[in-house]
Amino acid sequence: MTTRVDAGPGGGGCPDIFDGRENAGVLLSRLDRFNQRHPWSHNDHYSPWVVGQVAASGARDVLDIGCGTGNLVARLRDIATTVTALEPDAATVRVAAQRFAGDPAVTIVEADFAGRDHQRRWDAVILLAVLHHLPLVPTLRELRDCLVPGGRLVVVGCYRGAGLVDMLADLPAMVANPVMGMIKHPARVDTLPPHMTAPTAEPKDTLADIRAAAALELPGARIRRRLFWRYTLVYDAPSEPGGDSAN
């Protein structure tokens, strides 16, 4: 049973957050079928917000982890001097590489986060529906170390729903998701667009887990629950090594 998947009802790397709630199975199954027929990208929905966060930081050299086919890269290209984009999926990265072939400001690398240039630091690092594919605590620690002094980390992530609060918080999304599908993709389809076919993963960490890990590894990080089963995290590194965060 699925309430939504990242490559279906609203693509972006985040499959079900409530599993096994069979009492609502019939309704959720119908919603899922409808969403699959009218797909739209949650990632694209949040991309303007991400770009705004990066632009506000004044970042010039940007790292996009898990770039997919490059929709966010295209937006970042308008505000950054250089964009380095990592994507581990071979089929997806080919699309991105072809898209930006000949653009000296964009570097597309077929690699996951572990395959980045470990000697390099960036003004801004972005993960859009990617963090839940990675081990939470060590990844946050490494992300912090990827930033130059004063650099900014921007995350739009997925969390595992747990308890009544999460379930109630997700009710508006369950209603809004099919409405957005009809607005953004009114024509019924049988196959997903290419930018919504990247591999998915189930979120393992709850929002409480994420808040606790961020408090430990990214002191001062700002975390907010968002619509469509998402949260956002913004962290500004200290301007000087060993100093306090700019948050």
Language model segments and positions:
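Conserved alpha-helix/loop element of class I SAM-dependent methyltransferases that forms part
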Residues: S41-R60
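Conserved beta-strand/loop positions that form the S-adenosyl-L-methionine
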Residues: I65
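Short alpha-helix
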Residues: T200-P219
